[in-house]
């Protein structure tokens, strides 16, 4: 079971979220049949969305769009405050580029572009916020977004590690944020600890990476666990939803589908589930329009 744990330092100067997103990213890889670099890029964006959604309340939905100029194309993810996230990468077949230590790089495949966050509070008029991609490695881009757009100094670490067959081995991350009222010496102490943290990939390799992340963030400093919540890859598509989408088409288009294709087949971009609509379904939609 994937989870996100929310914590706050005893002094109230900082808060931290730590995530285990292994099954989330594994499910995404299975559904989209992504290659190595596209798996890591999509996985990191899913984790980034889970972090942002954890910052929200109510029935808020967050869409993250990584709009890069390179071969991966767009990466789109949607997360809500109930722990659900879904997403896809435009070009899932982008393959591997590794460092000398075996780390999978995604920046060259993302390229230059924008990090766009759409926040929908469920009352209409979603709020859009855009910052430039500074590296294309997603974690650094999220930290820059939080610092620039939300004016909240933030440290972010997130990654997806693959096994020898390029299947998801482990995925997760953390967010640390300065809270109002933090003293300069507290900020300096935490900044030093973050700078001295082992690489996120090293922490994720630990037997209990959640505890390893918390230990790396807080050291010997006291903190409180505020909550532990389940997170998951979950798409909200349905036959009814796509039926409504077909209903928005002109009658002439529906008639053409009925006569030439004898139905319609729609595949959800977010989870690759296929929905079939027969001539009877199309006839019903045409009749409702008349």
Swiss-Prot record:
CC terms in the record's Gene Ontology section: cytoplasm
InterPro entries xrefs: Heat_shock_Hsp33, Heat_shock_Hsp33_C, Heat_shock_Hsp33_N
Location (main, coarse): cytoplasm
Top-level taxon in the UniProt lineage: Bacteria
Subcellular localization(s) per the UniProt record: Cytoplasm
CDD domains listed in its UniProt record: Hsp33
Keywords (A to Z) from UniProt: Chaperone, Cytoplasm, Disulfide bond, Redox-active center, Zinc
Single GO biological process annotation from the record: protein refolding
Disulfide bridge partners, by residue number: 235-237, 268-271
Record-linked SUPFAM superfamilies: Hsp33 domain, HSP33 redox switch-like
Chain ranges passing through the membrane: none
Post-translational modification remark: Under oxidizing conditions two disulfide bonds are formed involving the reactive cysteines. Under reducing conditions zinc is bound to the reactive cysteines and the protein is inactive.
GO molecular function (one): unfolded protein binding
Family: Belongs to the HSP33 family.
Functional note: Redox regulated molecular chaperone. Protects both thermally unfolding and oxidatively damaged proteins from irreversible aggregation. Plays an important role in the bacterial defense system toward oxidative stress.
The protein, known as: 33 kDa chaperonin
Record organism: Streptococcus pneumoniae serotype 19F (strain G54)
